[in-house]
Amino acid sequence: MAETEKMKYGSLNRFAQAVTGLFLLFFLGVHLYVAHIDFGHPVAFFSSVINQLHNPWWLAFFLIFVYIITYHGINGLNHIVADTSISEKAKRNIGIALMVIYVITIIYGTILALLVARMTVPT
């Protein structure tokens, strides 16, 4: 029974990896267009990001983008570790370390986005 639960969790993790990968394609495309291109013309990156982060919808978009990127990367690393032949204890410890890195990264990303959203746009 424990093996079946482990397999389901692994399948769920791999499914989440695929879904977040698809979301990343969408988010990355929107991010690159909005942050770097304005109807085919280059725009000032820093000012455009600050302007966008003043809008609560764009702020939410970028925060979700950070959460999904971080989850996708950490989960991918965890899959790589799971496929190695190191001990289960080492895998568990690395998994815990990766969770800590995930939490620290999303806290940092959230704080940074909220601070940038409060900045005034340079003229």
Curated annotation (Swiss-Prot):
SUPFAM superfamilies: Fumarate reductase respiratory complex transmembrane subunits. Residues 35-59 are extracellular. Pathway: Carbohydrate metabolism; tricarboxylic acid cycle. Its cofactor is heme. One of its GO terms (biological process) is tricarboxylic acid cycle. Heme binds at H72. One of its GO terms (cellular component) is plasma membrane. One of its GO terms (molecular function) is metal ion binding. Membrane-anchoring subunit of succinate dehydrogenase (SDH). This is Succinate dehydrogenase hydrophobic membrane anchor subunit. The lineage of its organism: Archaea, Methanobacteriati, Thermoplasmatota, Thermoplasmata, Thermoplasmatales.
